[in-house]
Each structure stands twice: as structure tokens, then as C-alpha cells.
Amino acid sequence: MKLKNIKFKNILVIFIATALFTSCEDFFSDDNADPNAPVDVPISAALPSIQLSVIDSKGGVYSNFSNMFAQQVEGVARQWESFNNYDVQPVRFNQPWQQMYENVFVELITVKQKATDGGHNHYLGIAKATEAYALMMTTDVFGDMPFTEAGLGDVNSNPAYDSQATVIYPAIRALLTESLTLFNQASGPLVPGSDDVIYNGDVDAWKLAVHSILARYYLHIGDNANALAEAKLGFASRSDNMGYTYPGAGNDAPWYGFNDVRFGDIAFHPTLRGIMTGLNDTDRLGKLDVTFDANHPYLTSTQREDLISYRELQFIIAETSTNAAEKHTAFLNGIKASFEEVGLGTAEYNAYVAQPSVDPGVGNITNNQIMIQKYIGLFVQPEAFSDWRRTGIPALTPVAGSAVPRRWFYPENEYLFNESAPARNSNLLFEKVSWDN
């Protein structure tokens, strides 16, 4: 894997020398006198850059493709019409792969080392939690990927691919567990604050987030008991959500930026429209099934981009609980939070759930109903693609051919520059990752 230009996107002013354009392979060189080595960026400057790279990626191309394959949105013009018909090539995935490795994983190696050396426990906890989230987001669409040998630069420019099931996923759990331990210790000399763009250094909020990510983790691997237990330790309300609110005015949310520049390329999908219409979900349709341009009422320039949310956790509880009353309460909580997410209030929510087709009452809710409401509630959230792969809900009809994509291609650059990359496979888009049912 040949990593290229490291780009820093910090909310702080960072003075970067000409080394901005050097290869990240040099980042790990033993030659401290290397004139092309990057400047020594402090943790407080590196952290927001890393976090924003994850948030931008998740709300950008990860959502564009994953939610298109999940049939929440559809490509209707230019190259996106071809992508919608599953005519997509490995080169299209160079950017998201590069973004995660160069701007997140490689940078985190240095941040973790500095935090460890300095005894900055809470910075280290945030770094590990962020890495775990980014790893899961990446492996869930790519499957096996370089991890244990990634970021070694000149030492190994052809890192081996680690197994998702036996290496990557266990590493995710370990990182999350370690982060909880660190958050329960004293901060150390440096205390995270406004440089943590997600929680402003609030370690109690981070603990809730880690438990919430663990709930998703266990759900993916089919461990419902632990998914339920972790979900109950996670977010208690929407105010706990793990995410970032874009300020707008040029620093815009990813979907707004896409729609502003690529107006007419993507639209609301008929599959989701049909499901919502069948449930008389007119109020939410009025917020979502709108022309995808800069005036979209939900996909605004100042949209909050949640990495994981209270509504997702409530649907996890509804799916995994065996207690009928608990399942029903969580189901309704998830729907209500989904209404609030798009700016709707109690009156609209009450009218909607008054329908027996939506809420059949305690003891009568089916898994299909839970997953359909989660599918609606996680609009443009990549997790909707994971849910479909886990459960097969909703039933999706292929746009082209005989199958719906279940993952992404490996990027073209991996085939060109990493001798350890898997052999090319034209059918890879339709093959399952390890946890896919």
C-alpha cells in the first residue's frame, strides 16, 4: 500500500512546512534529519484534523455509496447514474481508502505514541475510540484490510491484509475496551478541550459513546446479549449523540456540499419512498423526499453529522431485547427520536404511531417492523447498509443484474502499488464480508 500526500484539515491554525507534500512513508523514517519529514504537530492540533477526516468521510462518500446500495438514495445523472446501476470501478474507491489511511490511521499512530509517552490518558482514550470507530467503518465496506502492518512506510510498503473476523474486529473491541480504562484514569498533564470537536473533552460523554459503538459492534457479529447490554450503557437521549455540527458558511456538511456542486446527480430512492408511503409517513417524506440541492430542508450546510446516535441505540434495544415491554418502549423511542431528527414534533409523531400498521402494541412488534423503522430513521446513515446486509430487511430488488452490492471494491491503487493486495475480482462487489448474513 503506497500512501501519498498527507493533508491536514485542522480547525486550528497550523504552520506546515514544505513537507506537506511529502509521502507519509517518510513519516515513519528513522532519519530525523530528513528535510522532507513532516513538522511535529502537537496532539491538540492533530486530533481535530483526524476527527474531522472521519466525520467528513462518513457523511461523504461512505454515505453516498452505502446508502445508494441500500436504496435510500439513487444516482440519476452523470457518473452517479452508472454507479446506481452497479457500474463502478475500483478507482472510485481510491479517495475514501486514502483518506482513512493517510489522514486517520497513520496520524493516529503518532498521536497514540505521543499520548502514551506523555501520560496523556484522555487523549489516548479519545484516539483509541476514534480509531475503533474508523476501523469498523472501513472494514465494514472493504472486509479484510491492512492493519497490523499498515503505516510502516519504508519498512514495509506492501502491508499484508488482515482478516476482518480474526484480527480487525477483535482489534476494534480491544481498542474500545482500552479507551474505557483510560477514561476512568486521571487525564494526565494535557487535558482535551475544544480541540476535541466531538465532545469538547468530556470523558463521561466519551464513555457513553464507547458503549454505544460496542453495541453496534456486538450487533454486527450476532452477539445480541452483549449488544443489548452495551446499548443500555450508551446514550440516554439525543443530546448524547456522537457527532459534529458543521458551522456552514464554506465549512459545510458533506451532503450539502455534494448537492450544491453535484445538483441533480442523486435523488430520493423509490424503494424508500414506497415503504414510507405505505406507512402513511407523509410528514417525514415532506422533510426527506425533496429535490437534492442546496435548499434541501434536512441536508443543510449546518447539518449535524452523527457517527452514532440515540435513535440507533433504541432500535438496537428493540431488536435484541426479549422483554416485550422493553422492546416496545425502545421501538417507540427510536421512532420519536427519528421524527425529532428531521425537525418534527410530538403531534406528528403521535399521529404516526397511532396507526396499528406502525405500532401494533406490546408483544406484537415484529423484527421486520423494527428494521423498517430503523431503515427510515437512519436515512443517509451508512449503518442502514450494514443492517440490510445483516437482516435482509427491507427486501431490495437489484437495480441491475441479479444481486445488490454487499461491499465495496478494493481501490485501484492497492492493486497497482501493494503486492500483498488480493487478486482482482470483478465480482467482489457482490461478495459478503465476514459478519454478513
Residue positions per predicted region:
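Long, intrinsically disordered, low-complexity segments
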Residues: 24, 203, 285, 300, ...
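Aromatic-residue-lined binding/catalytic grooves and analogous aromatic/hydrophobic interfacial grooves
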Residues: 24-25, 173-186, 203, 207-259, ...
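Membrane-proximal, proline-rich intrinsically disordered regions
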Residues: 24-73, 87, 231, 396-437
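Hydrophobic-face positions in mid-chain alpha helices that act as interaction patches
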Residues: 45, 222-317, 322-373, 377-378, ...
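Conserved, well-structured interaction surfaces
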Residues: 48, 75, 79-146, 152-187, ...
